[in-house]
């Protein structure tokens, strides 16, 4: 983040606006809505400012040019003049005095910037582009206007009104949170939105009085995070990610996806890197049981799909043995997502009538697979976790009958801006990888369908920096 978002309490506090035009007037209106006392410094003011002075006793005007002593006693400063020298003087003086300052349309002179605001008081939504594109921030706010009805303000007011009663009824924080999640996403909220305020209050109180303050029942959410692009998450995955109390995640979960988990959820890194598991599988299973028995909603977040080389079956088998409630949310597996973003269809009527998923993990320095079954014509082979064993993989496929010229590709960090695709053949792929070191996660695709990439590639990543090497081609 270039800026840290905060909300300031400026009620009945002295703020300074330097400038008397329409932009300064708009800023004054925002500060007035927040309850500030505003002092305006400008030789002249427009009619809009004159109206504000007549309407509000909390705004005053000094018809002078700016001087540093105007900052005395101010907690916030906004400069909105057409004179660069004046704006810079305000910025320099405010910084020297340690007072937050905003210079309109000049981020370099600001110590804070003004977001685009959606006001559903007491709910406030602020959208900022970091000063890079105020127009984009306003467009995003316009979208939020349609998504967040004005009645959300009343909903928040009721939540504040009954907060004390709910706190008194439930001794456990988890129970209070569960209660409010139920209220704010169910019939109570719908009644408020429909204007049935009395019915909403009656429903809330009845539900509260009938609720028992018992230890909550824990649950585990086994969620597939997909191959990396956050846009590929399912709606169900998003919902469960937002209500989890704790998340246990693997190395292959993209940081952008982890950022979408509820912010105050505890985070536990499980590792799952080759030969370096931060938590062994048995420890993960035991931890899931322990946390769920404590009444927590546990998000077990796995890259791709939890049931495809993800050991998800082992985890829920353990949960079932201990009678722990669980849900499973499938994710887009890497074979499907990465191949699509690489422009490689896994099946095609002219090239491949079947597709096989295998794992390429080395065991005793060999890849133990049914090579005869893999080395069949008109078949696509997708190899997970095959980077270290790629030489053995290619050698065995050739030895069992696939031509050396069989097209092959390896994709690094597929579906993300860091995606990089290297294409070659079974004979050349190991050399290509040796000359262009890649970092996991990677996926290997072998078969005639790889040839289609030259025509079907559509996803343009931003990390295409490798040079051309004889014997292979690299595409974005």
Swiss-Prot record:
Residue span of region Precorrin-2 dehydrogenase /sirohydrochlorin ferrochelatase: 1-204
EC number, as in UniProt: 2.1.1.107, 1.3.1.76, 4.99.1.4
Record-linked NCBIfam families: cobA_cysG_Cterm, cysG_Nterm, PRK06136.1, PRK10637.1
Binding site for NAD(+): 22-23, 43-44
A Pfam family recorded for this sequence: NAD_binding_7
Purpose of the protein: Then it catalyzes the NAD-dependent ring dehydrogenation of precorrin-2 to yield sirohydrochlorin. Finally, it catalyzes the ferrochelation of sirohydrochlorin to yield siroheme.
Source organism superkingdom: Bacteria
Region (Uroporphyrinogen-III C-methyltransferase): 218-476
Positions that bind S-adenosyl-L-methionine: 227, 303-305, 308, 333-334, 385, 414
InterPro entries reported for this sequence: 4pyrrol_Mease, 4pyrrol_Methylase_sf, 4pyrrole_Mease_sub1, 4pyrrole_Mease_sub2, CobA/CysG_C, NAD(P)-bd_dom_sf, Siro_Cobalamin_biosynth, Sirohaem_synt_dimer_dom_sf
Protein known as: Siroheme synthase
Gene Ontology MF terms: NAD binding; precorrin-2 dehydrogenase activity; sirohydrochlorin ferrochelatase activity; uroporphyrin-III C-methyltransferase activity
Modified residue annotations for Phosphoserine: 129
Metabolic or biological pathway: Cofactor biosynthesis; adenosylcobalamin biosynthesis; precorrin-2 from uroporphyrinogen III: step 1/1; Cofactor biosynthesis; adenosylcobalamin biosynthesis; sirohydrochlorin from precorrin-2: step 1/1; Porphyrin-containing compound metabolism; siroheme biosynthesis; precorrin-2 from uroporphyrinogen III: step 1/1; Porphyrin-containing compound metabolism; siroheme biosynthesis; siroheme from sirohydrochlorin: step 1/1
Keyword terms: Cobalamin biosynthesis, Lyase, Methyltransferase, Multifunctional enzyme, NAD, Oxidoreductase, Phosphoprotein, Porphyrin biosynthesis, S-adenosyl-L-methionine, Transferase
SUPFAM superfamilies in the record: NAD(P)-binding Rossmann-fold domains, Siroheme synthase middle domains-like, Tetrapyrrole methylase
Catalytic activity: uroporphyrinogen III + 2 S-adenosyl-L-methionine = precorrin-2 + 2 S-adenosyl-L-homocysteine + H(+); precorrin-2 + NAD(+) = sirohydrochlorin + NADH + 2 H(+); siroheme + 2 H(+) = sirohydrochlorin + Fe(2+)
GO BP: cobalamin biosynthetic process; methylation; siroheme biosynthetic process
Family recorded in the similarity comment: In the N-terminal section; belongs to the precorrin-2 dehydrogenase / sirohydrochlorin ferrochelatase family. In the C-terminal section; belongs to the precorrin methyltransferase family.
